[in-house]
Each structure stands twice: as C-alpha cells, then as structure tokens.
C-alpha cells in the first residue's frame, strides 16, 4: 500500500498541486477520505507502511481509487466528462514538455474508461510508470556520459 500512497503523492505533485499542505488547507484530503469511507487511522497506516512491502496494485481497494479521483476533482483538474484536463493543469502551473507528453500518452490509453475511479487509478499508475521509465532513461544517460569521460 505504500506504493499506492506514493502514487497518490506523485499524482498530486504531477498535476501541479504544490504540496500536501495545500490539499490539507483546503480540506481536500479530509473531504475525500470521508466521502470514500477511509478513516484517518487507515490513511495514516497507509502512510506509515514499510516501503519494502510489495503492493498488489491490481487488488487495490476501490475506496483508494475513488480517493484519487476525488482529489483530482476537488483540485479542479478534470474536464466536464471527468477526465484529466491538461490545459487546467497548465493554468495552475506551467507543464513541462516531457510531462505534457506523458499526460497525453496516458490520456490516449485511458480517456475512454467509463468508471471514474478506475480511470483515476489507471492514470496515476500510467503516470507513475512513465516517470519511472523516464528516470531510468535519464539515469542510463548519466551513466553513459560518465563512461565516456
């Protein structure tokens, strides 16, 4: 579940909501926890989990998937159909070309998903995997440059 928590944090960061404190100030987290029947204790347990635990993302509790959608919705990051709106994100804070490409690539795959909770979760997973791959490519490039020196 720690990976799920990290995915949530990454998503919030990716979609340009600057910090968890901003979410807390606007009560987004509390509101979304309550609307998805997630207790503060469950949320804290999710945060405190050991990072070495393997997560089975396929079996993620629907409440957490809907929690992610709720955060995006309350953050005004969705279009009228409930899908991520890159232009709205860009208005909050300019999006880099790399992030824009990743967002659109994930949207191409998942924007037909009718279940908004599943959509939000799949988008977060796609974004996370894309960033992991991007980081691996960047790291490989750095290592190649060091070898060439």
Curated annotation (Swiss-Prot):
<dbReference type="GO" id="GO:0005615">
    <property type="term" value="C:extracellular space"/>
</dbReference>
<comment type="similarity">
    <text>Belongs to the PBP/GOBP family.</text>
</comment>
<dbReference type="GO" id="GO:0005576">
    <property type="term" value="C:extracellular region"/>
</dbReference>
<feature type="signal peptide">
    <location>
        <begin position="1"/>
        <end position="16"/>
    </location>
</feature>
<keyword id="KW-1015">Disulfide bond</keyword>
<dbReference type="GO" id="GO:0007606">
    <property type="term" value="P:sensory perception of chemical stimulus"/>
</dbReference>
<dbReference type="GO" id="GO:0005549">
    <property type="term" value="F:odorant binding"/>
</dbReference>
<comment type="function">
    <text>Present in the aqueous fluid surrounding olfactory sensory dendrites and are thought to aid in the capture and transport of hydrophobic odorants into and through this fluid.</text>
</comment>
<dbReference type="Pfam" id="PF01395">
    <property type="entry name" value="PBP_GOBP"/>
</dbReference>
<keyword id="KW-0732">Signal</keyword>
<dbReference type="GO" id="GO:1990834">
    <property type="term" value="P:response to odorant"/>
</dbReference>
<dbReference type="InterPro" id="IPR006170">
    <property type="entry name" value="PBP/GOBP"/>
</dbReference>
<keyword id="KW-0552">Olfaction</keyword>
<keyword id="KW-0716">Sensory transduction</keyword>
<keyword id="KW-0813">Transport</keyword>
<feature type="disulfide bond">
    <location>
        <begin position="66"/>
        <end position="117"/>
    </location>
</feature>
<dbReference type="InterPro" id="IPR036728">
    <property type="entry name" value="PBP_GOBP_sf"/>
</dbReference>
<feature type="disulfide bond">
    <location>
        <begin position="32"/>
        <end position="70"/>
    </location>
</feature>
<protein>
    <recommendedName>
        <fullName>General odorant-binding protein 57c</fullName>
    </recommendedName>
</protein>
<feature type="disulfide bond">
    <location>
        <begin position="106"/>
        <end position="126"/>
    </location>
</feature>
<dbReference type="GO" id="GO:0007608">
    <property type="term" value="P:sensory perception of smell"/>
</dbReference>
């Amino acid at each position: 579940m720690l990976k799920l928590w990290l995915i949530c944090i990454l998503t919030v960061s990716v979609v340009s909501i600057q910090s968890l404190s901003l979410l807390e100030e606007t009560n987004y987290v509390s509101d979304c926890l309550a609307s998805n029947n997630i207790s503060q204790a469950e949320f804290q347990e999710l945060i405190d989990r050991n990072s070495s635990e393997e997560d089975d993302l396929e079996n993620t509790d629907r409440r957490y998937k809907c929690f992610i959608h709720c955060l995006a919705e309350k953050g005004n990051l969705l279009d009228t159909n409930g899908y991520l709106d890159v232009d709205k994100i860009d208005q909050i804070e300019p999006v880099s070309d790399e992030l824009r490409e990743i967002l659109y690539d994930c949207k191409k795959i998942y924007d037909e998903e009718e279940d908004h909770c599943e959509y939000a979760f799949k988008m977060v997973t796609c974004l996370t995997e894309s960033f992991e791959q991007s980081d691996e490519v960047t790291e490989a490039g750095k290592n190649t440059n060091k070898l060439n020196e």
